[in-house]
Amino acid sequence: MARIGFYGRLAERFGREIGIDLPDDATVATVRAQLGGLDPATIRALVNDATASEQTSVGPGDRVDFLPPLSGG
């Protein structure tokens, strides 16, 4: 099971953290598809605290964080 963390408006939608089961060949794109509505053009992904691409592998025990655009000053 992978842990998925959400911040900002995403935490309001999904909660701060959930666990999901993934196939053996899962990637960040797989996680986005399973959750739905996480546009890669605007929502940044981190895997185990490192910036991730859509092709980054995600396995059991990994943590994926999704961060919406930040604003303010």
For the regions a protein language model found, what residue spans apply to each?
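Ubiquitin-like/PB1-type beta-grasp interaction modules and other compact soluble beta-rich domains
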Residues: 1-72
